[in-house]
Amino acid sequence: MILSKRPHLMIRKLSEMLVPRSRSAAIKPEEYTASPRSPLDLNFPSPVHSKRFGSGGVGLGIVAALEETSNGINRHDPVRYSGRFRCPEIDLSDEEYTYVTSPNGPTKVYYNDDGFELSENDYRRVHKPMVTVDEPPVIERQSVRGPTEFLSSCCLCKKKLQGKDIYMYKGEMGFCSAECRSVQIMNDERQEQCKTQVSRNADVLSSPYAAGQRLSAGVFVF
């Protein structure tokens, strides 16, 4: 009997050295399957049960852990972006408004008759009245004669122009003939020459050189 027990003890020790106790204890007797004898005995794993990994497979456990963490991440989540510039709200009910932006300065909004300056740094609104430039009044062109007398008679000989050819001069003076118009042109040119001569004489008299010549012409004896 003693000789028969020794081989069993040696086999048990060798089995414990090759297979740890934790793993051998985890394996149940009903999990042992006999070797298949025919193709019908082959049990292929289904896709549903293929993801159930055993406790002994370290690499498969890492893959399963990575899949679980990746399932919790939604790759299609939109990226949220918060802009730095926030424009304060302006009550624009029914009035018209215009935005005027410049590349280096703040944004200005002209609303109705008031100007609002929007600063990008401290998000404040400054009320500024708009400066309106007064346009100069339009100078009405003065006509030589009234509207009732316009083109009713010749400006030189005073003949009636009704039913006759009219010769215009300067766009507002009508004459009965080319001769009257030529006389008027000559009179205007003579007046212009007289004006230029008078202004030239005034400039000569007011110059210091002309005053020196008048003083040097006289002889004073003491």
Curated annotation (Swiss-Prot):
The protein's name in its UniProt record: FCS-Like Zinc finger 13
Chief location of this protein within or outside the cell: nucleus
Described purpose of this protein according to its UniProt entry: May act as an adapter to facilitate the interaction of SnRK1 complex with effector proteins, conferring tissue- and stimulus-type specific differences in the SnRK1 regulation pathway.
Record flagged with keyword Cytoplasm: yes
Induction: Down-regulated by NaCl.
Keywords linked to the UniProt accession: Cytoplasm, Metal-binding, Nucleus, Zinc, Zinc-finger
Complexes and interactors: Interacts with KIN10 and KIN11 via its FLZ-type zinc finger domain. Interacts with KINB1, KINB2, KINB3 and SNF4 via its N-terminal part.
